[in-house]
Amino acid sequence: MIKGIGIDTTRISRIEKMVNTLTDGALGRLFTEAELSEAANRGGAASYEYLATRFAAKEAVFKALASLTEKKRFDLRIVETLNTPDGAPYVNPIYKSLQGEKLDSILQETGVTALHISMTTEGDYATAFVIAEGIDGPSGISPALAIITPPRAR
């Protein structure tokens, strides 16, 4: 069952500017070591595209989960997006932030069992789309449906 969806678009030029003006420490508060390492391996414009899609992914995951949890903010580093050997993106739910926060804990709290992600770039834009899949709420209906459907209409 779909529990949440999230989408985000960011300008690649915005990420390029961030990379060129922020310190390594500041970038390390936005991206994981693995994400920064892969971007460095790609080099040049490809590194900016890579980081822009990762930034959009972090925002899209947050949007997909925001209505399912009391948390209205979380450390962006807990959303680590990597690629399988064949190039498909995936969200690594077991990455742990420096504060000990883990995406896996939020997924368990919200009943989300899988995050499906798609990312793309076009011109100066990077977009990520996320579907949060999970189990029904305690009443047997989706919590999101319970929010938008008046009780007498159920």
Question: How would you name each of these model-derived features?
Answer:
Residues M1-R154:
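Core catalytic alpha/beta fold that binds nucleotide/phospho-ligands
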